Amino acid sequence: MKHPLCTLLSLITFMCIGSKGLAEQLTNENLTTSFLPANFHKENTVTNDWIPEGEEDEDYLDLEKLLGEDDDYIYIIDAVSPTDSESSAGNILQLFQGKSRIQRLNILNAKFAFNLYRVLKDQATTSDNLFIAPVGISTAMGMISLGLRGETHEEVHSVLHFRDFVNASSKYEVTTIHNLFRKLTHRLFRRNFGYTLRSVNGLYIQKQFPIREDFKAAMREFYFAEAQEANFPDPAFISKANNHILKLTKGLIKEALENIDPATQMLILNCIYFKGTWVNKFPVEMTHNHNFRLNEREVVKVSMMQTKGNFLAANDQELDCDILQLEYVGGISMLIVVPRKLSGMKTLEAQLTPQVVERWQKSMTNRTREVLLPKFKLEKNYNLVEVLKSMGITKLFNKNGNMSGISDQRIAIDLFKHQSTITVNEEGTQAAAVTTVGFMPLSTQVRFTVDRPFLFLVYEHRTSCLLFMGKVTNPAKS
């Protein structure tokens, strides 16, 4: 959509998730020598710039303070403001009881993600796989909301449930949200817990375009996004940006930027890359061809991984589904949700809420299980403009939107691109291929077989952050 009286702004997010070993060396475009994960703490994983020892900037040196004082800030438990609606059954504020500030924000981020997922699902066909990275989308919306005013700001805060967060406690205000996103970035992306989780936020501004200095300062303070000059009509800019994203995502996302409208004046970029190691690995020699039921009539052969170990699992009688938790090293896990009936996916998708996930997690039991899970790789590319419009965010995407906190000139967003890739396979470490796993007789253990369409949710547990979610309808398709 063109806005002749407006300049254009684009929001672009890129997400990658894999399950390969952590021994692979990391490289940086500004460095000729590769470095090992043992030195991971020396890299600023927000800006992707190498920081030589003894030359850390002030913001990075503040990390030690963040590990103490700031943890108290984000993990403090505040009283919930009483409201008439809170007493209603199933109200999400009931989940806030006993939860920290960062967990409360992430509960509402998940609520937004589930609503957005449902809109994407309605726009897709029943045979489509789906995959999104909620933390990236919420972060991008948080960044842009810094510059929104009036009704435009209210729309975003309502749909993202930021307003619900602020209203939950007399101690919360709008700035609290941005402070928590800042602390979440430190918690998730600047600490090495045994997995690789990296993020880059970028703010690209066309040369000579007037951006408010307080907006640029707030972007840096809360989201670590440094303003950089760009020449969007120049193909060299696209090439350079694509190379940067290619390296960040270890080659998983190629040609991320294809065409940028020459009228674009500002681009906000959010990239996330995750690589985790299974706690219970899938030996490669156990992978075999197995039937996967697409629907009542169609079956495809897929590469089915197999392992045995202690796993948390639950069954939901109300939604008629089974849930399995697959743990990554370091406090991240993937929930696999499988409807017992092929026709049960619609009900499951319609009723998925943070309250339901909480119920699953509280009802899980730990025992020895044999697990069969298909390998899969999903590559998805969405323009979320129409999706967000249908959810109630309209002024952000038309010429009447109030973004006066960004620039004195009128701006309209014409693109909100969300591109994501996930690879799930046997590899957890280099030794995974030669790991020997003994299997007990089936009569003495429980088998969890994922041989029909399923949902998956990837959570970081300490912050209750929903990193990724999706649906695998056909593992043989991307």
UniProtKB/Swiss-Prot annotation:
A Pfam cross-reference name: Serpin
Entry-annotated residues carrying Sulfotyrosine: 60, 73
Site (Reactive bond): 442-443
Name of the protein: Heparin cofactor 2
Posttranslational modification: N-glycosylated; different glycan composition appears to lead to two forms of this protein (68 and 72 kDa).
Gene3D superfamilies: Alpha-1-antitrypsin, domain 1 (2.30.39.10), Antithrombin, subunit I, domain 2 (3.30.497.10)
Keyword flag Mitochondrion: no
Region (2 X 11 AA approximate repeats, Asp/Glu-rich (acidic) (hirudin-like)): 54-78
Keyword Glycoprotein: yes
Keywords: Blood coagulation, Glycoprotein, Hemostasis, Heparin-binding, Protease inhibitor, Repeat, Serine protease inhibitor, Signal, Sulfation
Annotated source species: Mus musculus
